[in-house]
């Protein structure tokens, strides 16, 4: 439901996340268009994270660790295959993200089905769940600060020349590289 709402509210989301784009109609329209293409990826990545967690709990780490490679392969292939058919490489990459998310979801769902059948259950509020919830919110705040820094950086960069948001993104990727390599 939220994805549907955000899909149609994308112009307002772009105004909040990249207010500097409002001064450049072409950049704003492209951001809205790409946002509408990519936003459904959030459904896939949420399910991917859920299924990767189920795998990890059961001691199966390979599928969750390999899932980002599926997205990277999808992005590379989309550049080569889709760019000639579409108007820009940005369009190809936007669709590549969506396709990659779908393949990540399928891959992890199949990995989970090998040993577990997902089902919806009503949680019992026992000691373990209370402890989890007590530890969850400080962890959420801690990880949220990093994401908030990225959002603030994006807002500021939207007022700078074209390419500044990409530089912020690349800097974040470099910042995460040691964690990705050494875990």
Task: Describe the predicted segments one by one.
Residues 1-183:
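Membrane-embedded alpha-helical bundles of multi-pass transporters/translocases
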């Amino acid at each position: 439901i939220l994805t549907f709402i955000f899909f149609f509210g994308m112009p307002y989301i772009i105004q909040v996340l990249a207010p500097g784009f409002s001064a450049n109609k072409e950049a704003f329209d492209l951001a809205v268009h790409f946002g509408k293409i990519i936003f459904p990826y959030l459904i896939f990545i949420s399910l991917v994270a859920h299924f990767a967690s189920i795998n990890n709990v059961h001691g199966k780490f390979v599928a969750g660790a390999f899932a980002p490679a599926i997205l990277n392969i999808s992005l590379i292939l989309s550049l080569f295959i889709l760019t000639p058919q579409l108007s820009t490489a940005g369009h190809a990459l936007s669709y590549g993200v969506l396709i990659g998310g779908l393949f990540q979801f399928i891959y992890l769902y199949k990995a989970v089905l090998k040993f577990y059948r997902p089902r919806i259950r009503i949680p019992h509020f026992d000691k373990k769940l209370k402890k989890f919830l007590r530890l969850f919110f400080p962890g959420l705040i801690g990880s949220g600060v990093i994401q908030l820094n990225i959002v603030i950086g994006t807002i500021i960069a939207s007022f700078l020349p074209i390419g500044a948001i990409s530089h912020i993104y690349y800097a974040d990727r470099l910042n995460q590289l040691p964690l990705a390599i050494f875990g």
